[in-house]
Amino acid sequence: MKQAIVTGAGGGLGFSICKSLSENNYSVAALDLNLNDSEKTSDKLNNTKPYAADVRDEESIISLYEKIDNTPDLIVNNAGIARFGKLFDQKLSDFQDVVQTNLIGSFIVATEGAKRMVKEDKKGSIINITSVHSVNPGPGVGAYPITKSGLYSLTKLMALEWGEYGIRVNAIAPGFIDSGMSKPFFENPKVRKSRGKAVPLQRLGSADDIANTVLFLASEEASYINANEIVVDGGVIHSVLMHLPRD
């Protein structure tokens, strides 16, 4: 079995990623800030162990890697937070929290894992979960788009520097996904209908849409895909002209 580490494993998207990997020849280290959250995922899955660590804390992540028996073949940086509100209303602490978790946390987890891959001569894969906000930032979400576009830039830099060791680094940018931190947003029937209709495929995405993309990028079939961001959004970021009047 291959070894995977998934951060943010306690959420809906994290659970689906862990589930997909655990059913496809991976032993999964399900990581969340609180052990109770990671246990909610691991208790429902085979081949999955729960771990608690703070992705923002380098020592916490080093300790995590020492607890996991095997060097990872795959790292999925899925942990992320948002502090909603317009920029004028954002506190500096809000901004810093999002940057620390989404960008710096991903840097710490990926770098510590990659060091171990290199030491063990393991040609692994790292997948960073970004967002369509990294392509077209939306208002009212504070530092979130900035961290996601920064994470894509970090993805490309990691891929360039670590490619010589056989480590591939890619990103996945989810669109309107009915899971995780977006799920409460889509519980409003009006929002759910309008957002679904805005997508060329006429539906919201599911957590499985992202989990399946993770599985593909981690596979041998994707062995020559590197330094890329796969946008999984049903085409919504390219749909602006669909919604403008033509006469």
Residue ranges and their predicted role:
Residues A110, T147, T155:
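Active-site helix of classical SDR
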Residues G10-G11:
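Conserved glycine-rich cofactor-binding loop
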Residues S131:
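Residue(s) in the substrate-gating loop at a strand-loop-helix junction
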Residues A171, K190-E221, I225, V232-G234:
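C-terminal helical subdomain
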Residues G163, R168, I225-A227:
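Short, small/polar-rich loop/turn modules that mediate ligand/substrate recognition or access, typified
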Residues N226-D247:
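Short C-terminal tail/terminal secondary-structure segment
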Residues K86-L87, D94-V99, R195:
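Substrate-binding pocket helix/loop in short-chain dehydrogenase/reductase
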